[in-house]
Amino acid sequence: MQEIKIRCRGIITHGGKTLFVQHTERDFYNLPGGHIDYGEDPQECIERELLEELGVRGDVGRLLYVHTFKNSAGEQTVEFFFAIENGADFLSHEALEKTHAHEIAEVVWLTPEDTHLDIRPKCIEEFFQKGTLVHGETVRFLKS
């Protein structure tokens, strides 16, 4: 039986910049987040993931994107992207205790001009570069 993987990601912005993470053993940058645990709802998932990876309790805002894709192994994934409303709280994340810090190689604040970096998923890159990652009133459904 085929399973669908479910992940949640947080879009954290402050002062025109967006927070991205580079996981260990990866050569690209992604929005923080991870897989949903059994019994969790998507909001609980992103709250837990932000605490684990960055040591900050995120103020989860509205759902911005739903992204579906199949990876090279044919596994299907659905990702939920939420606005995180307390971006300033993440500015000093280095000093905070993280339970899963070993999973993160680097945390960076990027501007839309940082086009030389490999940002994923590619389907959000256009919105990021235009500065419209958290704009709009409706949920955007993306497929890649």
What is each stretch, according to the model?
Residues 36-59, 70-119:
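Unchanged
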Residues 64-70:
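Short, solvent-exposed loop/turn elements at beta->coil junctions and helix N-caps
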Residues 27-29, 99-144:
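Nudix hydrolase/Nudix homology domain
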Residues 1-31, 58, 86:
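N-terminal strand-loop-strand
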Residues 10, 63, 82-84:
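A structural signal for short, well-ordered beta-strand segments
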Residues 25, 33-35, 67:
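Short, well-ordered turn and helix-capping elements at secondary-structure junctions
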Residues 21, 92-94, 136-137:
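Short, hydrophobic secondary-structure boundary micro-motifs
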